[in-house]
A protein has these predicted regions:
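Short beta-strand and strand-turn-strand segments in soluble, beta-rich domains
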Residues: 84, 94-104, 148-151, 193-201
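Short, solvent-exposed loop/turn segments enriched in Ser/Thr/Gly
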Residues: 65-72, 164-170
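Intrinsically disordered, low-complexity Pro/Gly/Ser/Thr-rich segments with frequent PxxP/GP/PP motifs
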Residues: 100-127, 197-223
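Bacterial N-terminal signal peptides that target proteins for export
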Residues: 2-12
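Short acidic/proline- and small/hydrophobic-mixed sequence motifs that coincide with surface turns
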Residues: 80-85, 100, 129, 178-183, ...
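Sec-dependent signal peptide cleavage junction
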Residues: 19-40
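Asparagine-centered strand-capping/turn motif at beta-strand->loop junctions
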Residues: 74-80, 173-178
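Terminal connector regions
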Residues: 123-166, 222-237
């Protein structure tokens, strides 16, 4: 392991504020956001894409398949009802507007006035995508209570360089709820200035109430785009 480990000192807060570390500052969890992204106009569905992005990995000497990594930060603007199984859809096109592929990602739930992040990837054959369209489908509201993201707290976030692959992100997450969970999703959004440039998610199973668990996120991409900050989000899964 290289000695120059990028260490990020994350504040022990639930709603993350940007924290200046030794190299890459980290934002933990949901409601406070460090970006000044242009928010999409709220639709009648009350499901808002707060931020979204994609990263295109072209073909190279090791792979004749191109990939698109995509993500969307989505907010439930309803004050009383939760959203069950939120869905984002993705369409990748070439420079002529021809569709290279389409995909979707489905989440678990979003509590009222809460925000979660959905991520995934897709291949576009041997042609790298030129444009990628990301949309949120009309949500399904429910009176069932959803786990809020502010019951999770992340600490000790660190970017660890690796010899043959891009740096992994490690840290710890504390669950402050009172009921055990089947699992959680932990997402890192890599930022360059105000722009999100990459995102990756990992999952942990069997989370006990009051427990603290270590995690690591190993990006599947061959390399990470240049970035100067990382936001970490946790949700029930």
């Amino acid at each position: 392991m290289k000695s120059a480990i990028k260490k990020v000192i994350a504040a022990c807060v639930v709603c993350g504020a940007m924290v200046t570390g030794l190299s890459v500052p980290v934002t933990t969890n949901v409601e406070a956001t460090t970006i000044q992204a242009k928010k999409q106009k709220k639709s009648a569905s009350k499901l808002e894409i707060v931020d979204s992005g994609y990263y295109v990995q072209p073909t190279d000497e090791y792979s004749d398949t191109a990939y698109v990594y995509f993500w969307a930060k989505i907010k439930n603007n309803d004050k009383k009802k939760s959203i069950d199984f939120p869905v984002i859809t993705v369409t990748a096109k070439d420079e002529s507007g021809n569709v290279l592929g389409s995909s979707s990602q489905t989440g678990m739930s979003i509590a009222p006035k809460d925000t979660v992040v959905l991520t995934s990837m897709m291949d576009t054959g041997d042609t790298p995508a030129t444009t990628v369209e990301i949309k949120a489908k009309k949500p399904k509201f429910t009176s069932r209570k959803a786990i809020k993201s502010n019951v999770f707290e992340t600490t000790n976030i660190t970017e660890v360089p690796q010899e043959y692959t891009c740096a992994k992100l490690t840290g710890e997450v504390t669950y402050k709820g009172k009921k055990d969970l089947d699992g959680i999703a932990i997402t890192a959004i890599y930022k360059s200035g105000d722009k999100s440039v990459f995102a990756e998610t990992t999952y942990l199973n069997d989370i006990e109430a009051g427990s603290t668990e270590a995690f690591e996120i190993n990006p599947l991409s061959n390399e990470l785009p240049d970035h100067d900050s990382v936001e970490v989000y946790v949700q029930n899964w």
